[in-house]
Amino acid sequence: PPGSDVANLAVFGYDPQKYYTGRSPLEAVSMNVPLELTDTTFRTNLVTLSDAENYEDKVMVDYSSDEISTDEARELIKYVNEKLGCDEYEFFGGFSYRHLMVWHNKENNFSLTPPHDISDRVIGEYLPKDETILNLMKKSYDILKDHPINKEREARGLHPANSIWIWGNGTKPNLDTYKERFGIKGAVVSAVDLIKGIGYCAGLDVLE
């Protein structure tokens, strides 16, 4: 079955075979992250992995880190960007567990697994083949597992957001607006960056 990104593009009247360039670039539009045609974007989840010693042996415990609060999550993503971001790639905070990485001047030739597809599974066979992305994920575990926010979450009986999981890659979208296609205006209401991003690209008013 199609993912929510492909499905919602179709619901808005856009043929995914013509217009789909990935999930994360639509979310980037909603987050006001400027994109170049040469950028590749990635959805970056804050996930909970088990504490197995080797990263490859860890289990995907929770792809949403107990639906982590946006305030906590943005602080963690800010920390990840400070420690791991650089001129080549950078991280941007979104909402709850849903965040963004932009890799500048990088071809979009990745095959990546959504974390919600591997709940309760050992992650080894689903890890990215790209060494840079894999190393970012591994390093994120090292810097997040003992972060004070995660220690506080564990003390409250909540799952720690102890790793990033990079997936949902794509490139800058280019949708014809509703005004161009149909000569009409419209509006969209949503709490989700994906839907808001489609709305912005379609030239619709996005109501908060």
Give residue spans per PLM region.
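Active-site nucleophile/metal-coordination loop of metallo-enzymes that catalyze phosphate/sulfate
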Residues: 1-77
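Short loop/turn segments at secondary-structure transitions that flank enzyme active sites
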Residues: 17, 50-52, 107, 170-173, ...
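Glycine-rich, mobile lid/loop segments that gate access to catalytic sites or pores
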Residues: 63-163, 169-170
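Terminal, contiguous helix-loop blocks that mediate binding/assembly
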Residues: 128-132, 149-208
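Residues in well-ordered beta-strands of folded domains
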Residues: 12, 45-49, 102, 165-167, ...
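Short, solvent-exposed polar/charged micro-motifs at secondary-structure junctions
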Residues: 3-8, 99-103, 174-176
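A short, structural micro-pattern
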Residues: 3, 38-40, 93-95, 158, ...
